[in-house]
């Protein structure tokens, strides 16, 4: 109503020439903002800036270089600023020794993430204190809102300010009950998408094929089978994600005081997508809300139902229970999870096939592990499920948490892929919000408004933590094999030296769900397909993001033996 009213007012009271003049003014102000940001290098006593060439245009060149090579200045700072000479690189260190051997020097790098400002990189000795800092001093929420502009890009401030989705995630997607549902949809989505070709067949674009499959699987747990198999629903969900990234990039180029004015136009496509999802789910949401409080055993147990329950308990239940707000949360959760899982699994497949081209034998070893799990359970219920999937052409069964827990090598392989193919060079982003700043134990102080992060790529490739870190070792995380002391095999286990899901109180709440999903995806491929080994297609860096090749295809056939 408000948007249509604004449009009516503009059409009846404002001339197109004045609109054009306003747009030109916004462009001029934004251009001046960008130029000033690129030329101005603020002085910060005691905290070195890394990666800025000399000269008046050095800052501009550094920001430009960070678009395609954002990893370079962070690697330089980690190597030359935040480190002291190590003990012998071949000597195994405990985590405590490793942290002691680092200097604890914070450094800053220019970045597009913070609207051409600096991101302050927290070295390893300070990570425990950094993660333990109270939210009212070092804020995860403010970091999200400032860096990712979530009140705009995710279409509401409630996703960060009122995170009731966390309770919904914990109640539905972290207890193991989701495994059976995920397993069923994994089989259905691969059967529909890849089918079981008897001859070698090329999947033209692996990343986007997996994105479609993963989005379907995830939404089986989010909204149920009916809607996750609705192509309009899935395609709208998929289209939402790149538009978030595009809108975020545009809004970073615009001064903060102009964003409320410009954002309705910038966000118009994703607002339309939200309206479309609302039109698909609206009646279902109304039906489910009418069932609240009933003891009907047929009530759904998916994430949407949990969101409705959590919204009803909220002090702002009227606003939170609005169907459009519930849809907004679903879109945000799809954005956060689906792209990340698709990137991670695409990286894993390319690493596996590259290892096969090198003759390392991981494919057969993992296939044997999954085969043994598949064959070991011959209960009547499981045998019936095997017959059910066999009728569809798939070698599969009704999986549960006990089955997936037996995938030791598969899980170690996937965790090694998350380490080796880290999808970003900066993680655990925060903003200093304490008016007095925040002082670390080594005396270094970050001022209010400072944006900070942890150098995850460098930590995951640190030879003091991971012997021969540039070698992909699928057995690295098996119990008693390789790596730093005290490591556990579980992908979902976080620490200061394994940060794929963050660490501490702000670790990814969906990591248990994601780890189960990745294992099931790989298990299905191992049981049902042969894949031609290839050398790994070249990866791509976009700012701080490390992406697999987005255009490379994959050649498969139905398993022949």
Swiss-Prot record:
It is a single-pass membrane protein. It comes from the Eukaryota. GO terms for cellular component: membrane. Its EC number is 1.-.-.-. It holds the Pfam family p450. It is an enzyme of class 1 (oxidoreductase). Pathway: Secondary metabolite biosynthesis. The keyword Transmembrane helix applies. SUPFAM superfamilies: Cytochrome P450 (SSF48264). GO terms for molecular function: heme binding; iron ion binding; monooxygenase activity; oxidoreductase activity, acting on paired donors, with incorporation or reduction of molecular oxygen. InterPro entries: Cyt_P450 (IPR001128), Cyt_P450_CS (IPR017972), Cyt_P450_E_grp-IV (IPR002403), Cyt_P450_sf (IPR036396). Its cofactor is heme. Keywords: Heme, Iron, Membrane, Metal-binding, Monooxygenase, Oxidoreductase, Transmembrane, Transmembrane helix. One of its GO terms (biological process) is secondary metabolic process. The chain crosses the membrane at residues 19-39. It is found in: Membrane. Its main location: membrane. Cytochrome P450 monooxygenase; part of the cluster that mediates the biosynthesis of a highly modified cyclo-arginine-tryptophan dipeptide (cRW). The first step of the pathway is perfornmed by the arginine-containing cyclodipeptide synthase (RCPDS) avaA that acts as the scaffold-generating enzyme and is responsible for formation of the cyclo-Arg-Trp (cRW) diketopiperazine. AvaB then acts as a multifunctional flavoenzyme that is responsible for generating the cyclo-Arg-formylkynurenine DKP, which can be deformylated by avaC. Belongs to the cytochrome P450 family. This is Cytochrome P450 monooxygenase avaL.
């Amino acid at each position: 109503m408000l948007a249509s009213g604004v449009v009516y007012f503009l059409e009846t009271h404002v001339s197109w020439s004045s609109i054009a003049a306003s747009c030109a003014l916004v462009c001029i102000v934004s251009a001046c903002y960008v130029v000033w940001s690129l030329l101005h290098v603020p002085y910060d006593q005691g905290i070195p800036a890394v990666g800025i060439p000399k000269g008046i245009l050095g800052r501009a060149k550094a920001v430009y270089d960070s678009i395609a090579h954002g990893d370079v200045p962070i690697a330089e700072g980690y190597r030359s600023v935040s480190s002291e000479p190590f003990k012998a690189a071949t000597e195994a260190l405990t985590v405590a020794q490793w942290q002691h051997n680092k200097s604890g020097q914070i450094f800053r790098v220019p970045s597009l993430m913070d609207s051409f400002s600096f991101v302050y990189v927290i070295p390893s000795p300070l990570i425990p204190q950094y993660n333990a800092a109270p939210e009212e001093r070092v804020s995860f929420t403010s970091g999200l809102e400032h860096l990712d502009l979530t009140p705009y890009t995710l279409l509401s401030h409630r996703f960060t300010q009122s995170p009731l989705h966390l309770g919904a995630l914990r109640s539905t997607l972290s207890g193991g009950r989701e495994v059976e549902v995920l397993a069923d949809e994994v089989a259905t989505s691969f059967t529909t998408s890849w089918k079981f070709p008897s001859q070698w067949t090329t999947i033209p674009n692996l990343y986007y094929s997996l994105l479609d499959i993963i989005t379907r699987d995830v939404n089986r747990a989010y909204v149920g089978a009916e809607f996750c198999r609705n192509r309009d629903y899935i395609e709208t969900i998929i289209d939402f994600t790149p538009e978030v990234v595009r809108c975020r990039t545009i809004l970073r180029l615009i001064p903060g005081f102009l964003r409320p004015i410009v954002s309705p136009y910038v966000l118009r496509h994703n607002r339309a997508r939200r309206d479309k999802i609302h039109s698909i789910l609206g009646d279902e949401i109304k039906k489910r809300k009418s069932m609240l409080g009933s003891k009907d055993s047929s009530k759904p147990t998916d994430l949407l139902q949990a969101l409705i329950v959590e919204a009803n308990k909220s002090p702002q239940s009227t606003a939170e229970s609005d169907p459009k707000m519930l849809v907004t949360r679903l879109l945000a959760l799809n954005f956060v999870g689906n792209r990340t899982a698709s990137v991670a699994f695409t990286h894993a497949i390319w690493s596996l096939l590259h290892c096969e081209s090198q003759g390392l034998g991981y494919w057969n070893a993992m296939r044997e592990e999954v085969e043994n799990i598949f064959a070991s359970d011959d209960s009547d219920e499981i045998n019936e499920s095997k017959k059910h999937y066999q009728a569809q052409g798939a070698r599969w069964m009704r999986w549960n948490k006990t089955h997936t827990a037996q995938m030791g090598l598969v899980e170690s392989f996937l965790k090694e892929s998350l380490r080796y193919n880290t999808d970003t060079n900066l993680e655990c982003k925060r903003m200093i919000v304490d008016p007095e700043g925040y002082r670390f134990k080594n005396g270094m102080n970050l001022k209010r408004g400072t944006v900070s992060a942890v150098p995850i790529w460098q930590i995951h490739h640190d030879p003091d933590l991971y012997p021969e870190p540039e070698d992909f070792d699928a057995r690295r995380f098996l119990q008693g094999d390789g790596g730093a002391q005290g490591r556990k095999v579980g992908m979902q286990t976080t620490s200061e030296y394994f940060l794929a899901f963050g660490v501490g109180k702000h670790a990814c709440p969906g990591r248990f769900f994601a780890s189960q999903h990745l294992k099931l995806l790989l298990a299905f491929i191992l049981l049902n397909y042969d894949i031609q080994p290839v050398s790994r297609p070249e990866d791509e860096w976009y700012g701080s993001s490390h992406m697999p090749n987005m255009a490379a295809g994959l050649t498969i056939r139905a398993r022949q033996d």
